[in-house]
């Protein structure tokens, strides 16, 4: 049992927000996403937005897969030292993972099923909007996943070029 249930839950949401939609939109596997500069940078920025919303809501976020929440947020805001540390941690995690690891949202897209995007990137964006915290990447990620669900577009790494 934890006295910090909401902080731990939001921290889990941060991990999901930085990975699931991005893999669904790009079609990339977990290691492709985390080891390549462009998707990794988008992932870190998605996390940063989610962390700032959680902090503004008063949640005490916990370390996520060896990454301090504040350091991860700063990495997404361009702090070079924080970014170097986060890139190292993501690389360590990728080396422990199989190359065919695929987040559940990407699997849902592959199978033509509706995703939980409204409860991940969409939820971050909604809560951010309610408290005046901008979450443009989470908003865009949610919209892209929904467009893919409706078969308006196909998953592709090119979809994150404008991020």
Regions found by a protein language model. Name each.
Residues 6-34, 38-52:
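Active-site-proximal catalytic alpha-helix in oxidoreductases
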Residues 33, 42-163:
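NAD(P)-dependent Rossmann-like dehydrogenase/reductase catalytic/cofactor-binding core
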């Amino acid at each position: 049992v934890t006295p910090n249930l909401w902080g731990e839950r939001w921290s889990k949401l941060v991990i999901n927000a930085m990975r699931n939609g991005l893999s669904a939109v790009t079609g990339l596997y977990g290691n492709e996403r985390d080891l390549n500069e462009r998707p990794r940078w988008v992932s870190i920025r998605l996390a940063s937005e989610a962390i700032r919303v959680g902090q503004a809501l008063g949640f005490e976020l916990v370390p996520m897969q060896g990454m301090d929440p504040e350091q991860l947020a700063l990495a997404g805001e361009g702090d070079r030292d924080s970014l170097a540390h986060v890139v190292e941690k993501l690389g360590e995690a990728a080396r422990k993972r199989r190359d065919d690891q695929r987040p559940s949202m990407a699997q849902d897209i592959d199978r033509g099923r509706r995703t939980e995007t409204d409860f991940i990137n969409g939820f971050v964006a909604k809560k951010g909007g309610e408290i005046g915290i901008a979450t443009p990447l989470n908003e865009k990620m949610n919209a892209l996943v929904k467009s893919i669900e409706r078969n308006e577009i196909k998953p592709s790494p090119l979809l994150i070029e404008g991020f």
